[in-house]
Design a protein with these regions (language model features):
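Helix-loop-helix "hairpin" substructures at the membrane interface of multi-pass membrane proteins
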Residues: 198-269
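Structural signature of hydrophobic alpha-helical transmembrane segments
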Residues: 66-80, 122-134, 201-205, 252-265, ...
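Small-residue-rich segments of transmembrane alpha-helices in multi-pass membrane proteins
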Residues: 29-33, 103-113, 157-169, 235-248, ...
Length: 330
């Protein structure tokens, strides 16, 4: 290969990378503003009336129902923050941490169901799930640091142990159960109520703002933690930031994807984008594009064929990943 050929390929790659970033920003920023307005309850009623009329003109009235907009809004934010946080998780070789946090959050849901049912309070399970998710993530770090268990052993212990605790708590709760636990295991569009939408909107905006503010430091710590420590960065603090953001994203996404599948949105879009990306930044933008495509296509399939949205979303994401593998190996 001549120097001219190499330069031409490099320029072509930079052009493709710039195109992905421009497309993501061109469609992503207006969509983020729109879904933020919906999540905050600021979207004018005329928007929903017009959407209903357009849908009716095409023979469907699904756009007339609130649950559809709730699911789309939560899904849009899942497709955004899952890959954003997941990019740092995957490149730090922590792919299984999302699965562990999800199972720890399940224990929190079980605990919250037991406690709230016993005392008769009508409160959200989000706080219980978030606390146990963070405890599970910290538990993995502590086991890795203070025991001889290496590799994925601490992850496997916390993953299995937290899920087992959840099962035991559900059995102990018996008649105190106040929610359909299957909706948390597999996801359910019908439980994405207005409160869930508001929580996910706030969570997503907070995560995006935090990652944006600490982007350079997180990037440094991700690729060279030793050099980052020498440079004076508090690596442990940024590790905790990534773990905390992962916990928040996992718990916020459980309502639509379910505990079993929620970790997929942290890993699969990033893995797909990584097959064709040549830089961290392009992988980040590409993973968001894959995540949003998987969410909207998956929801469309779920509503068309009456299947669970979490499974449909992940199936689409895996399909995109396999296509990216085929393209990347050419």
């Amino acid at each position: 290969m001549t120097a001219g050929d190499a330069e031409g390929r490099s320029n072509a790659f930079r052009g493709r990378r710039g195109l992905v970033e421009r497309v993501t920003l061109l469609f992503g920023v207006p969509a983020l503003v729109a879904f933020t307005a919906i999540g905050a309850g600021l979207m004018p009623s005329q928007f929903f009336e017009a959407s209903c009329a357009v849908g009716a003109a095409f023979g469907t009235r699904i756009a007339c129902f609130d649950f559809m907009w709730n699911a789309l809004t939560v899904g849009a934010f899942v497709g955004l923050v899952g890959p954003v946080v997941g990019t740092f998780v995957v490149y730090r070789e922590m792919a299984l941490i999302g699965e562990t946090i999800a199972h720890a959050a399940f224990a929190g849901v079980a605990l919250g169901t037991l406690v709230l049912g016993a005392v008769g309070w009508n409160a959200t399970l989000f706080a219980f799930a978030l606390v146990t998710a963070v405890v599970g993530a910290v538990g993995v770090q502590r086991l890795a640091e203070h025991t001889d268990a290496g590799g994925d052993v601490p992850v496997a212990i916390v993953l299995a142990g937290s899920f087992a605790v959840g099962v035991v708590l559900l059995d102990l709760g018996g008649g105190f159960a106040t929610v359909e636990i299957g909706s948390y295991l597999f996801g359910d569009v019908s439980i994405t109520d207005d409160r869930s939408v508001r929580v996910m909107t706030l969570v997503s905006l907070g995560v995006v703002a935090t990652v944006t503010a600490a982007y350079k430091q997180l990037l440094f710590v991700t690729f060279d933690p030793r050099a980052a420590r020498v440079a004076g960065l508090d690596v442990s603090r940024y590790d905790a930031l990534v773990v905390g953001a992962t916990a928040v994203v996992v718990v916020g996404s459980m309502r639509i994807l379910g505990v079993i599948l929620v970790a997929a949105m942290l890993v699969v879009p990033v893995a797909a984008a990584g097959q064709v990306a040549r830089s961290f930044r392009s992988a980040l933008y590409g993973s968001v594009l894959v995540g949003e495509t998987a969410v909207f296509a998956g929801l469309a399939l779920a509503w068309s064929y009456g299947v669970r949205p979490g499974g449909a979303i992940v199936v689409v994401a895996v399909g995109i990943y396999l296509a990216a593998v085929a393209v990347g190996n050419r």
